[in-house]
């Protein structure tokens, strides 16, 4: 992908006015309820390549300011080597990360994460495992627009990925060069998030673009574009708790990797996932989970096939 165009989604809807007789709105609970869909975040907790990049899309968090722990698992099928046609090798990418979002001003927040990676691929010669600290990420999130009389909100983000995780040059010789703890490079992210909310329903539209630079080994992973549309529906609530379900689509597009400035063949690709999940909050504690299954996958020119993704997080409001 040689060029990228950020897409600004804009949806117009008439405002909905609530009265005291409206059973959806309870004055004591209203402040907590209006934050339900507030924190659809931009984040790619990534290694950063055609598969195994660790992108979980955009998180929806019940607490607008929090610290927490998240587990994220991915499963791929890959060719054993470049000389066979069958996808027989199972690859598992696992991430356990600390993350948080802290407000700086009314409109500006800082979002960050530090992952611990433990990956495995099952080869004909035996299992290969790697583990260790991954690349840290920091992003500033700014509320660009929030209408007073409707439920429209637009936010933007600028972020950087810090190369803390180990990059092993030997790992790029296999079918999947992203079997790494980190990219070894400073990478930069641009993001947009649009929210429409009406009563107990919300729709989130998100897009982000990651610019990946060349590392010290003169290897450069391809730039990455993520996009997602997620619908949320409040299934149950009382004065202290909310339980919501979510359903959506998430897509990812990857440019070619490069080494010594030359394009590496069979490294670009794309995938589209359907996702289903839930989120529950009790006072300042929130728990969420999500399952993602591919509806389309063409990673590394077909040498890698996405199988599934699963995530689970526990957050504590500040």
What are these regions (language model features)?
Residues 56-58, 69, 98-102, 112, ...:
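Residues on the lipid-exposed face of transmembrane beta-strands in outer-membrane beta-barrel proteins
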Residues 55, 82-86, 121-128, 175-180, ...:
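Extracellular loop and loop/strand-boundary signature of outer-membrane beta-barrel proteins
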Residues 18-70, 74-76:
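Outer-membrane beta-barrel biogenesis signature
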Residues 20-26, 38-40, 56-64, 107, ...:
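Short loop/turn motifs that connect adjacent beta-strands in outer-membrane beta-barrel proteins
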Residues 119, 126-222:
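Outer-membrane pore/translocation modules
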Residues 78-80, 86, 219-318:
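Outer membrane beta-barrel transmembrane domains
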Residues 67-75, 112-116, 156-162, 205-209, ...:
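Transmembrane beta-barrel strands of outer-membrane/channel proteins
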Residues 63, 90-96, 130-136, 152, ...:
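Residues that define the transmembrane beta-barrel architecture of outer-membrane proteins
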């Amino acid at each position: 992908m040689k060029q990228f165009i950020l897409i600004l989604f804009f949806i117009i809807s008439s405002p909905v006015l609530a009265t005291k007789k409206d059973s959806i709105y309870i004055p004591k609970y209203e402040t907590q309820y209006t934050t339900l869909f507030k924190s659809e975040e931009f984040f790619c907790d990534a290694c950063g390549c055609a598969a195994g990049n660790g992108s979980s899309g955009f998180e929806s968090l019940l607490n607008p300011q929090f610290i927490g722990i998240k587990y994220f698992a991915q499963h791929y099928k890959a060719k054993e080597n470049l000389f066979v046609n069958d996808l027989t090798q199972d690859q598992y990418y696992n991430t356990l990360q600390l993350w948080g979002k802290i407000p700086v001003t009314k409109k500006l927040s800082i979002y960050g994460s530090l992952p611990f990676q433990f990956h495995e691929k099952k080869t004909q010669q035996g299992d290969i495992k790697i583990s260790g600290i991954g690349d840290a990420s920091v992003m500033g999130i700014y509320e660009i627009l929030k209408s007073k009389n409707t439920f429209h909100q637009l936010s933007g983000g600028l972020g950087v990925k810090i190369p803390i995780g180990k990059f092993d040059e030997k790992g790029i010789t296999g079918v999947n060069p992203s079997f790494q703890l980190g990219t070894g490079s400073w990478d930069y992210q641009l993001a947009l998030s649009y929210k429409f909310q009406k009563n107990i329903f919300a729709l989130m539209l998100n897009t982000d673009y990651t610019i990946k630079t060349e590392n010290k080994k003169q290897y450069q992973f391809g730039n990455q574009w993520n996009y997602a549309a997620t619908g949320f529906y409040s299934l149950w609530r009382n004065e202290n708790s909310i339980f919501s379900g979510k359903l959506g689509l998430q897509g990812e597009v990857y440019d070619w990797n490069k080494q010594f400035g030359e394009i590496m063949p069979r490294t670009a690709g794309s995938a589209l996932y359907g996702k289903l999940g839930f989120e529950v909050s009790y006072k300042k504690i929130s728990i969420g989970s999500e399952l993602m299954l591919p509806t389309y996958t063409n990673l590394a020119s077909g040498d890698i096939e996405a199988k599934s993704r699963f995530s689970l997080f526990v957050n504590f409001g500040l």
